[in-house]
Amino acid sequence: LFDDIKYLTEQADVSIINFEFPIVLHAGVPIAKSGPTLQGQPAAVDAVKYAGFNVCTLANNHILDQGTKCCIETRELLENAGIKTVGIGKNSAEAATVLYINQKEKGTLAIVNCCEHEFSIATDTTAGANPLNPIQQYYNIQEARTKADYVLVIVHGAVSYTHLRAHET
């Protein structure tokens, strides 16, 4: 599947991929939402690792499609495979955590990952994705600038089935 790009990802200092679905280890329970509910199998983690990706963004509109348990299990599976993750958490504070990657002589990279408010957003008490909030991300970026040499902001936007812009954009 990734044979054509593997040589590129393996040469990169940091290679990032978005994981657009939760992994389902058990009978998933799709959430009520507009649009499709996606799910993946554990072999997807092996494919990402084989391809040479070492960071996975998880803040997107499908990460909660099979519920909070699958969301958190997806992060655990990726991290157990040696792939760093960013953009989700057991609550909104954890989901907003900035990922720092120290590249020794090349410096430290900070990654901020968030997404539009659809069906996947973490709350104060529930797991999910880091919501797009320009004020929160501004402060996260300012703090990251004091701790890292480079700051990368990745915003996932995918408002489905509408011709209108989301109010957050």
List the predicted regions and their residue ranges.
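Acidic, metal/ion-coordinating pockets
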Residues: 1-165
